[in-house]
């Protein structure tokens, strides 16, 4: 399970070091094999342990090819997917096209989302988080969440 928000830095070569608390889990789950792709709704990347990505990819491929929305989703998620491998220091090299999409430069934020991670530019993350908090205050709690105890 991946959770928490971690502020990190990209090195000059575009490598990101996974925090040590995630490395052993990633090595156990997928031998350090991770897939990165774009988030089509937000300016960030999504990083999946390889087995979780393979399940998602199978589901994406099963979508009807004559459905324009399904084809668009397949093109965006599968088309931008890159296989990454943790090196001996727990780092992955993020391909330039993915860094460009998410505007990743030096300061980045890794956000655990249980079975995957999101990777954000630090400024974009701060702005999005502020916007989400403002929206949550204005919108209130959806009915579906009314029974949760936080």
UniProtKB/Swiss-Prot annotation:
Disulfide bonds: none annotated. GO terms for biological process: negative regulation of DNA-templated transcription initiation. The keyword Metal-binding does not apply. Pfam families: MraZ. One of its GO terms (molecular function) is transcription cis-regulatory region binding. CDD domains: MraZ_C, MraZ_N. It is found in: Cytoplasm, Nucleoid. Residues 5-52, 81-124 form the SpoVT-AbrB domain. Keywords: Cytoplasm, DNA-binding, Repeat, Transcription, Transcription regulation. One of its GO terms (cellular component) is nucleoid. Transmembrane segments: none annotated. PANTHER family: TRANSCRIPTIONAL REGULATOR MRAZ. Belongs to the MraZ family. Forms oligomers. This is Transcriptional regulator MraZ. It comes from Alkalilimnicola ehrlichii (strain ATCC BAA-1101 / DSM 17681 / MLHE-1).
């Amino acid at each position: 399970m991946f959770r928490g928000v971690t502020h990190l830095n990209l090195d000059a070569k575009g490598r990101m070091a996974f925090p040590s608390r995630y490395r052993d889990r990633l090595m156990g789950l997928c031998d350090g094999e991770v897939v990165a792709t774009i988030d089509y709704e937000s300016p960030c990347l999504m990083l999946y342990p390889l087995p979780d990505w393979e399940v998602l990819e199978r589901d994406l491929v099963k979508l009807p090819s004559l459905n324009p929305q399904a084809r668009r989703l397949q093109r965006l998620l599968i088309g931008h997917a890159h296989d990454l491998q943790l090196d001996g220091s727990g780092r992955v090299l993020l391909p330039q096209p993915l860094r460009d999409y998410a505007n990743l430069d030096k300061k980045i934020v890794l956000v655990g989302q249980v079975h995957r991670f999101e990777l954000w530019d630090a400024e974009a993350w701060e702005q999005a988080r502020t916007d989400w908090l403002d929206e949550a205050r204005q919108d209130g709690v959806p009915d579906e969440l009314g029974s949760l105890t936080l």
